[in-house]
A protein has these predicted regions:
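Conserved nucleotide-sensing/catalytic segment adjacent to the nucleotide-binding pocket
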Residues: 47, 60-103, 115
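Hydrophobic positions on the alpha1 helix immediately C-terminal to the Walker A/P-loop
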Residues: 36
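Active-site signature of alpha/beta-hydrolase-fold catalytic machinery across serine-
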Residues: 39
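Short beta-strand-centered segment that lines the nucleotide-binding/catalytic pocket of NTP-utilizing
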Residues: 44-59
Length: 153
């Protein structure tokens, strides 16, 4: 999978300066989004922003919100804390949502000096617009997905 992704990145670099850009990696649960983003960040140089860090806090979990596709994502916070800062090329930080405490936790520093891989379900949600230079959707067959989820928990 990493070789295929590297070919995608190489093709992308032909139209964008080498070593920069925002790649959003969406896809099905357990398809390998986090693993691929982290491997590419190490291989090509870059940072990873995890959509899991933007879970919706309990106070905002209304029935209406939970019925929306992607309603479990605190997209307002992602829209203000991440998207406007991606194009700058400057380091920035945001606070990770800590599911064990159900509140904001540690501050995450994004170096933003190369590729930024935004990975996770709903990273390509329409509410975010076209903040990314490229979108990648990772799919997985049902059996492998089930096996990975069982092994994860």
């Amino acid at each position: 999978m990493i070789q295929k992704a590297e070919r995608i990145i190489e093709a992308y670099q032909k139209v964008k300066p080498a070593g920069c850009g925002v790649i959003a990696m969406d896809g099905r649960a357990a398809a390998g989004k986090t693993t691929l983003a982290e491997e590419l960040a190490v291989t090509l140089g870059g940072a990873v922003v995890h959509m899991d860090d933007f879970f919706l806090p309990p106070a905002l979990r209304t029935l209406e919100r939970r019925s929306e596709p992607g309603g479990n994502v605190h997209y307002e916070r992602f829209l203000t804390e991440v998207i406007p800062k991606l194009a700058s090329g400057n380091p920035f930080s945001y606070r990770r949502f800590d599911c064990s405490r159900m509140s904001l936790g540690e501050e995450i520093l994004v170096k933003n000096n190369g590729f930024v891989f935004v990975e996770g379900a709903y990273s390509c949600h329409p509410v975010f617009g076209d903040y990314m230079d490229r979108r990648v959707f990772l799919d997985i067959d049902g059996k492998t997905q089930e096996d990975r989820i069982r092994n994860r928990n």
